[in-house]
């Protein structure tokens, strides 16, 4: 009976050693997802803030341009409609 216990104990020890993972080399395709997530959130935040700034800057320039323009368009503008207006005002 003691022989059976020793045999079982040796077999269980061998199984435990077989199940224990040997140190493996680093897999080159294993990524640190926490760092990737943080980096992605930082880049997304920077792009979001830049987008808001661009939108606000365009809105400010459009308001500035419309406040500066009053009445008839400048004669320097080369649109067809402005050239017709200039010609029609000269005939009077």
Swiss-Prot record:
This is Phospholemman. It comes from Oryctolagus cuniculus (Rabbit). Its main location: membrane. Expressed in ventricular myocytes (at protein level). Associates with and regulates the activity of the sodium/potassium-transporting ATPase (NKA) which transports Na(+) out of the cell and K(+) into the cell. Inhibits NKA activity in its unphosphorylated state and stimulates activity when phosphorylated. Reduces glutathionylation of the NKA beta-1 subunit ATP1B1, thus reversing glutathionylation-mediated inhibition of ATP1B1. Contributes to female sexual development by maintaining the excitability of neurons which secrete gonadotropin-releasing hormone. The lineage of its organism: Eukaryota, Metazoa, Chordata, Craniata, Vertebrata. Residues 67-92 are annotated as: Disordered. One of its GO terms (biological process) is potassium ion transport. The modification Phosphoserine is found at residues 82-83, 88.
